Amino acid sequence: MLCQKEFNSKRIEKIITYLGTDYLLPVEEILNWNITSEQKLIGKYKSQKAETNYGGRTWIAWFTTELPFADGPYIFNGLPGLIVSIQDSNNEYSFNLIEVKKGGNIFDARTKTVKIDWKKYETLARSYFNDPYDVNSKIRMGKTVTFTGPNGVTMDISIKSKEMQNSILQDNNPIELNHKINYK
C-alpha cells in the first residue's frame, strides 16, 4: 500500500503496480475528522482520539502533538499532529507507529507512472482477474505459457489461473470498500 502525498497541494495518490506498470490513482475523498476529548498514552506519546470516514469504513485514530509532524500512514492526514495508531471499526485494518527516527533523503526509483481513475482501475483489476497471467496477450504474440511445479512437472495453465482467481476472491477486502470490485 504505497501512497504519494504532496502536502502543499494536498494531493494524495495511491500507487498500484499492474503487470510491471506503476499507476497513480487519485484519492479524492476529504477526511472530515471528529476530534474527541478522549486521551491515552500510546507508547511514550500522549495521544488524542479522532474519528473519520474513508472508503466506506469508519476509522478511529490516535494522534500526538508531541512530535512536529501532521501526517499519518497511508492516505490519513489532516490532524493537528502525527497519527500514531489508526484502525477501522471492524478491526480489519490497523496501522501503528513503531519508531520515529531521523532518516536520509527518500528516493523513489519510479520514473514512469500512468495516472488513472477508479473506473480504469476497475477495468485493469477485472482484466487481471480474468487472465491473471496475461496468457491471452502472450498467445496472440505467438508465445507459449507453461508452469512448472516444484517437482518439475508441467502444470495446466487453466488450473494455475483458477488458483489465482480463487486467491483474489478470498483476499477481496480492500481498504476502500466503496471501490470493492465484484468479480462475479
Model-predicted segments: where are they?
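Extended soluble regions of mature proteins
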Residues: M1-K184
